[in-house]
């Protein structure tokens, strides 16, 4: 699964890109549902701050 670090600026690019809708808005940053995430890396590729990391 992927994780979203504190560099997240809540722009929503990752959530819009996720093909399985595993990313949702959390408190202060977006969060990845590890059970739904398919590790495709689409979110990591579009994050402007590099906040999305492979776990």
From Swiss-Prot:
GO molecular function, one term: electron transfer activity
Pfam families the record matches: Fer4_9
Entry binding sites for [4Fe-4S] cluster 2: 18, 37, 40, 43
Cofactor note: Binds 2 [4Fe-4S] clusters.
One term under GO cellular component: cytoplasm
Record: residues binding [4Fe-4S] cluster 1: 8, 11, 14, 47
PROSITE patterns: 4FE4S_FER_1, 4FE4S_FER_2
Cofactor: [4Fe-4S] cluster
UniProt keyword list: 4Fe-4S, Electron transport, Iron, Iron-sulfur, Metal-binding, Repeat, Transport
Superkingdom per UniProt: Bacteria
Keyword Ligase: no
Functional note: Ferredoxins are iron-sulfur proteins that transfer electrons in a wide variety of metabolic reactions.
Protein name: Ferredoxin
Source organism of this protein record: Thermoanaerobacterium thermosaccharolyticum
């Amino acid at each position: 699964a992927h994780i979203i670090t504190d560099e997240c600026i809540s722009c929503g690019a990752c959530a819009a890109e996720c093909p399985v809708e595993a990313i949702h808005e959390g408190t202060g940053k977006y969060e990845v549902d590890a059970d739904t995430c398919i590790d495709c890396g689409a979110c990591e590729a579009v994050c402007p701050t590099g906040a999305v990391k492979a776990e």
